[in-house]
Design a protein with these regions (language model features):
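Beta-strand-rich N-terminal accessory domains
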Residues: 1-69
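Beta-strand-rich recognition/accessory modules
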Residues: 1-5, 40-43, 100, 106, ...
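Hydrophobic residues embedded in beta-strands of well-ordered beta-sheets
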Residues: 2, 20, 99, 125-127, ...
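Acidic, contiguous internal or C-terminal segments within carbohydrate-active enzymes
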Residues: 4, 103-141, 145-147, 151
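Residues that act as N-cap/strand-start positions at coil-to-secondary-structure junctions
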Residues: 7, 17, 54, 83-86, ...
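Glycine-rich, pocket-lining loop/helix-strand segments that form or immediately flank
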Residues: 29-42, 67-89, 156-177
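Extended, loop-rich substrate-binding clefts of extracytoplasmic carbohydrate-active enzymes
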Residues: 72-122
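Active-site/ligand-binding surface loops and adjacent short beta/alpha elements
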Residues: 140, 148-198
Length: 198
């Protein structure tokens, strides 16, 4: 576990999965504290690379060619959230308030190198993901994070969105809806919803 700090902010990061295991302001958790179990879904936040979520049927067509993906966890039939959250990352630089980890993946459809940089200032955590395709073919890539927030009556969230995807069977993205219902509109600071939202 790598521990970064700056003023009242503290961040714990693991090289197993490149996950955040905790982020605090003084003693207040800003993300759900991780269990430090080596399992990304027990962490505070994990990286999504080379894409997020699932691909229907574990297959996609890109530039006229079909690509087949293999499930990457025992408990889901899909190639879930890519590989970064399951891999062993390497530390390439570290200071009291900054850390840079890299991960290289060279099996299956995707061959890539991703770097994840963490930086604390007095009042901000900045996390940056950068991925480079190292395969022979051009492929679609995406990056993101899967954060877990503390669930309490005081928890508030704000995130810009102009729409959302309905969830269909097997947690796959369904139809895109441009009209956000009030309980899912986080363009302004709002409490967390009371129902499951994926």
């Amino acid at each position: 576990i790598y521990t970064l700090s700056h003023g009242s902010l503290k961040l714990d990061v693991s090289d197993q999965g490149g996950v955040i295991e905790g982020f605090w302001r003084d003693t207040t958790p800003l993300l759900r504290p991780g269990k430090k179990s080596g399992v990304a879904t027990d962490a505070s936040c994990f990286p999504l690379v080379p894409f997020a979520n699932r691909v229907s049927g574990n297959r996609f067509v890109w530039q006229g060619r079909e690509y087949q993906l293999q499930p990457n966890v025992e408990w889901d039939a899909h190639y879930l959230h890519g590989d970064g959250w399951l891999g062993q990352w390497q530390c390439v630089s570290r200071s009291e308030d900054s850390l840079c980890l890299v991960y290289e993946h060279r099996s299956g459809v995707y061959h890539y190198r991703v770097s994840q940089a963490f930086h604390l200032t007095a009042d901000t955590l900045t996390v940056t993901l950068s991925v480079t395709n190292q395969g022979a073919e051009t492929l679609p890539f995406g990056t993101g994070w899967h954060p877990y927030f503390p669930l309490s009556p005081q928890t508030r969230i704000q995130a810009q969105a102009s729409g959302y995807w309905l969830e269909r069977e097997q947690w796959l993205a369904g139809e895109f809806c441009e009209q956000l219902p009030q309980e899912l509109d986080f363009n302004q600071l709002a409490p967390l919803p009371h129902q499951w939202v994926n």
